[in-house]
Amino acid sequence: MADISIKFPDGAVKAFPAGTTPADVAKSISISLAKKAVAAKLDGQLVDYLTPLASDGSIEIVTKDSDDGLTVLRNTTAALLRIALKKEFPAIRLGKVSADEDGFFVDTDKDDQQVSVDELDALAVIVEKLVSDKLDIERITVSKADALADAKDDQFTTALINAVDGDSVPFLKIGDYQILSDGAQLTNTGDVKKFKLLSVAGAYWQGKSSNPMLQRIYGTAFYKQADLDADLARRQEARERDHRVIGNQLDLFFVDPKVGAGLPYWMPNGATIRRTIERYIIDKEVSNGYQHVYTPVLANLDLYKQSGHWAHYREDMFPPMDMGDGEMLELRPMNCPSHIQVYNHHIRSYRELPLRIAELGMMHRYEKSGALSGLQRVREMTLNDGHTFVAPEQIQDEFKSILDLMVKVYADFDIKDYTFRLSYRDPKNTEKYFDDDEMWNNAQAMLKGAMDDLGLPYVEAEGEAAFYGPKLDVQTKTALGNEETLSTIQLDFMLPERFDLHYVGADGEEHRPVMIHRGLVSTMERFTAYLTEIYKGAFPTWLAPKQVTIIPVSEEKHGAYADKLAAELKAADIRVNVDKRGEKMGYLIRDAQTHKIPYTLVVGEDEMSNGSVSVRKYGENQTTSMSSDAFVKEILADIASYSREND
């Protein structure tokens, strides 16, 4: 049998007989590697450990302690779950299977009833039996005709089979069961170690809302119990921080199916948080030279054709509204064309630059139902949006100014866990970007120079720039572990050209400005969700929807004193309520703690007689007695403390 050439990650090349498996290759390197290995990457493609190698190629051995090793384990655990579902519910139909860095899932459909969370334990027992049986996992090929005949009563498996090219379909044979193959697999069921079936949720078939709703069973798997325990603890923490859960607990927002998915209602508590953020942002921007505007949420479709949004983002836009007289109106997906109109409303001079325009602008995006999530992914959103028009030589200074403002805003919200990413064009594929080499080279050098001057750490990402200019993304992670862009500074050389923007220079001639897109804190919806999760609902006093709750020991005896205190606090712009529900004192105090109110004041006979209050802070067990005047000073100092770092 002829030899094949196998290239290793270090560049070395070695000859092996055709038919050699990754297991053979691993053994040729070391016994210890072979013991840890579970699969391989052949020319970048994840394959089984026992896959025969038929031709030359590059190989990377995949071990248990790698992300790919976990994916292989989860592929196999998902395969065993599919068998368990068939054993427990013979008529069940099976849809998509997927495994990734967060676990795995299996989509299912039952005619009679749904798989309940209570049945997950029974399914886990079946999976554990398959593991203890230590069954070999064989990869076999079945003719497409036979596979379709066997799946005639399962429309979803039938669709998956039909999606496979060719006349044969890859299957896995595990014991007496044959199931569709999904990704690289372990060699034996006994290699599945620690797993957990987590939850059940709904998911549309193939992600399309027009398709049937299936049940998605989620799970995860690890090679070590300690890793599984740590992951389960992380998930529990994420659940406790989930803004959708906290939003319900604190009555911040809700979504009404009668109105539509992705269209949240802000309740008074949530609206108070949002209003406080908006006022803060506007004040911050105005003090930094931004001019705030209001622009229409509707615009003629021609505006978005000229900007390029209609050509490039049409799928993310709602259908145009035909006004019947040839006029087509569109809900705006972005604010930048509107701000360009503000710039273009007057002849601009170089003396006006940088011209900074900002708005809390409402936008609409045609998000699919399956992508919607609480406040993080919605169809109607209000973006903290800003656009600066600068002369080319002002780019670096303006970039520094924007970045300095961003960092100050993060400090005020106590946001610390973020990273900077500079995104450049791909130097090997420049034709897909705005065509001006000198502009790109100068702009990228200016952004990099600004970051270096400020001493801020960053990563560089070639090929991640937008078509029209380089950018800086500020990346963070949500409490659920998802990476999210918190802020962006985007240079744009294209829109000023599309809209023929000019300013009159010192030489009396017209010059083209550069446009800088800038979002400090994303949308109000997404930022509120993010803050809810990082604070775990315990908002700092300046942001808390209710800052103080006053509990009179007896409404009849002490209610008037509680009302007097509340009036004094309201006069100082402190958000306060008096709890006169008449429940037991212990219950009312616990309820205030449950709703994460920063200060709880208890007033009784002693407090009323000497003009004092008994103060309990959120998260603390002890109470402190002080005069009402002293408390007002303390809470006002607490409210003002968020901006001390920036004074």
UniProtKB/Swiss-Prot annotation:
InterPro entries hit by this protein: aa-tRNA-synt_IIb (IPR002314), aa-tRNA-synth_II (IPR006195), aa-tRNA-synth_II/BPL/LPL (IPR045864), Anticodon-bd (IPR004154), Anticodon-bd_dom_sf (IPR036621), Beta-grasp_dom_sf (IPR012675), TGS (IPR004095), TGS-like (IPR012676)
Domain TGS: start-end pairs: 1-63
Keyword annotations of the record: Aminoacyl-tRNA synthetase, ATP-binding, Cytoplasm, Ligase, Metal-binding, Nucleotide-binding, Protein biosynthesis, RNA-binding, tRNA-binding, Zinc
Gene3D superfamilies for the chain: 3.10.20.30, Anticodon-binding domain, Bira Bifunctional Protein, Domain 2, Threonyl-trna Synthetase, Chain A, domain 2
Superkingdom per UniProt: Bacteria
GO molecular function, one term: ATP binding
Assembly with partners or alone: Homodimer.
Name of this protein: Threonine--tRNA ligase
Organism listed in the record: Levilactobacillus brevis (strain ATCC 367 / BCRC 12310 / CIP 105137 / JCM 1170 / LMG 11437 / NCIMB 947 / NCTC 947) (Lactobacillus brevis)
